[in-house]
C-alpha cells in the first residue's frame, strides 16, 4: 500500500538500517547508535565509554526524571542536594514526589561552596533523609550564567566522595562553550565516571526536535546486604517500567549527525562533536558578543547600579541591580516584570523563582534584584538577527536606566 501510494522503498529491499529502526531491537535501542556515540563523545573527553551503559532518554529532562524515579521508588524519604539558584526543571520534577525534599547550597563566582555542601548533606541525614546525589549544571550554569572553575569542581568531587553521594551532571551546554580549548574545565564524568551520572542531550547542538539524550554512569550501587549492582542496570529497569525509551528512528537520525560526507559518495564517522557544535556556536557566540558589548556600552559607566556575569558557556547572563534607584530598591518581582512588558515591550525572566524554597527561607531577598538574560535568540537570520538582538538589548538598557532613575 505504501509503495503504491507514496512510492516508498520495496519492503523486500528495505535498507537494513531502516529495518532496524522500525523493528524490535536491543532493549537500549539500536546498538550502532550507542557504539558510534560512545566513540565520538569519548574521544572529546579522553574516556573509553561502555556503550552498554548508555541509557537512551528523552533529552536530558528524561534523564532527570529517570534518576529521580529510581531513588524515589523505595518510598524512603530522599533529599536532593542542588545549587541555589538551580535549574527550574529539576525543582519542578523533585516537587512531583511527596517524599522528596531539596537542600540547596549557596554559590559564589566559582560554584557551590564546598563546606556548605557538606553541611547540607549532613543536615539532611540528621533529619532522617537518604541523600542519593547532588544535581548541577556545571557548564554554562542555568540559570547562574557562569561555569564552575576547575578548582571548585575538584573540591566538590572531594566532598561527594567523602560523603558517599553521586553527582548528577546535567550537560546541555557542554559544547556551548566560549572559552579557549585549553581553558575549558573538565566535565565531572571525565574526572570520576564511577561517581557521576552524566546526562547528555543533543538538543542544543543541532537536533532539538527529536529530544535525543543519554544517561551514562559507571557507578556501582549497594542494594542490600552489601550486594552491589551497576547503576546503569538499575536505570535500565527503571526506564523500562516508566516507558521512557526513545524512538529508534530518532536515535538513528542522531547517529547520522555523527557522520560527515567523505567526498566519495559515502560517509565517515566524526572524530569529535566540536565541529558539529560549531555550526550553532557561530550564532550563539555572536549573540553573546552583542549582548555584552551593548551592556558595557550603555551601562558600563554605571557599575554602581548594574552588574552582569560574563558567561564562558551556555545561553545566559545574570543581570543584577546593585544599588537603590531614585525611588528605592529595584525589586525584580511580578510587578516589575509586568512593568517591563507594559512600558517597554520587554519580556524578562526573574531569578527568584530559580531559588529552591529553603534558599528563600534563608534569604527572603534571594534573586529579588536579578534577571536572567538569554542570548540564544535565532528566529531571524544573518544581519536581521544581529539587528534584532542589538535592538532588544538596547531596549533593555533603556528600561534598566529608567528603573534606577538615570536619564536617557
Pin down the residues of each PLM region.
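Glycine-centered flexible beta-alpha turn that most often forms the glycine-rich phosphate-binding loop
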Residues: 170, 353
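Short hydrophobic/aromatic beta-strand micro-patches
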Residues: 216, 318-320, 374-376
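N-terminal basic, amphipathic alpha-helical segments
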Residues: 1-13, 19, 236, 240-249, ...
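Conserved core of the PLP fold type I
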Residues: 2-163, 168, 174-191, 197, ...
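Conserved glycine-rich beta-strand-loop-beta hairpin in the small C-terminal domain of fold type I
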Residues: 86, 248, 272-292, 296, ...
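PLP-dependent enzyme catalytic core of the Aspartate aminotransferase-like
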Residues: 31, 39, 48, 125, ...
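Conserved core segment of the aminotransferase class I/II
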Residues: 13, 124, 193-285, 293, ...
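A generic structural signal for well-ordered alpha-helical segments
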Residues: 94, 160, 299, 340-341
Amino acid at each position: 500500500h505504501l509503495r503504491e501510494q507514496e512510492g516508498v522503498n520495496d519492503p523486500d529491499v528495505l535498507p537494513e538500517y531502516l529495518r532496524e529502526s522500525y523493528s524490535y531491537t536491543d532493549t537500549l535501542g539500536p546498538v550502532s547508535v550507542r557504539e558510534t556515540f560512545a566513540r565520538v563523545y569519548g574521544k572529546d573527553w579522553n574516556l573509553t565509554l561502555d556503550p552498554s551503559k548508555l541509557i537512551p532518554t528523552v533529552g536530558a529532562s528524561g534523564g532527570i526524571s529517570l534518576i529521580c524515579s529510581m531513588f524515589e521508588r523505595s518510598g524512603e524519604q530522599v533529599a536532593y542536594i542542588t545549587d541555589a539558584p538551580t535549574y527550574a526543571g529539576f525543582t519542578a520534577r523533585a516537587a512531583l514526589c511527596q517524599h522528596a525534599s531539596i537542600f540547596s547550597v549557596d554559590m559564589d563566582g566559582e560554584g557551590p561552596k564546598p563546606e556548605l555542601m557538606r553541611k547540607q548533606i549532613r543536615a539532611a541525614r540528621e533529619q532522617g533523609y537518604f541523600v542519593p546525589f547532588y544535581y548541577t549544571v556545571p557548564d554554562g550554569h542555568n540559570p547562574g550564567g557562569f561555569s564552575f572553575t576547575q578548582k571548585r569542581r575538584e573540591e566538590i568531587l572531594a566532598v561527594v566522595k567523602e560523603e558517599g553521594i553521586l553527582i548528577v551532571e546535567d550537560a546541555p551546554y557542554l559544547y556551548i562553550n566560549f572559552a579557549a580549548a585549553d581553558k575549558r574545565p573538565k566535565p565531572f564524568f571525565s574526572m570520576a565516571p564511577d561517581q557521576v551520572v552524566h546526562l547528555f542531550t543533543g538538543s542544543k547542538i543541532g537536533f532539538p526536535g527529536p529530544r535525543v539524550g543519554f544517561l551514562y554512569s559507571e557507578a556501582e550501587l549497594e542494594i542490600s546486604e552489601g550486594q552491589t549492582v551497576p547503576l546503569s542496570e538499575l536505570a535500565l529497569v527503571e526506564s523500562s517500567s516508566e516507558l521512557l525509551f526513545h524512538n529508534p528512528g530518532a536515535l538513528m537520525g542522531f547517529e547520522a549527525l555523527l557522520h560527515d560526507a567523505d567526498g566519495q559518495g559515502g560517509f565517515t564517522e566524526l572524530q569529535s562533536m566540536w565541529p558539529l557544535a560549531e555550526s550553532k556556536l557561530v550564532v550563539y557566540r555572536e549573540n553573546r558578543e552583542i549582548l555584552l558589548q551593548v551592556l558595557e556600552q550603555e551601562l558600563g559607566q554605571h557599575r554602581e547600579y548594574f552588574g552582569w556575569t560574563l558567561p564562558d558557556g551556555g545561553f545566559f547572563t545574570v543581570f543584577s541591580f546593585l544599588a537603590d534607584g531614585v525611588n528605592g530598591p529595584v525589586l525584580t518581582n511580578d510587578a516589575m516584570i509586568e512593568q517591563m512588558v507594559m512600558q517597554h515591550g520587554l519580556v524578562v525572566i526573574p531569578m527568584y523563582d530559580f531559588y529552591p524554597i529553603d534558599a528563600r527561607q534563608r534569604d527572603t531577598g534571594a534573586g529579588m534584584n536579578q534577571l536572567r538574560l538569554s542570548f540564544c535568540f535565532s528566529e531571524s537570520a544573518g544581519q536581521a538577527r544581529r539587528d534584532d538582538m542589538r535592538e532588544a538589548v538596547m531596549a533593555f538598557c533603556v528600561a534598566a536606566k529608567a528603573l534606577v532613575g538615570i536619564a536617557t
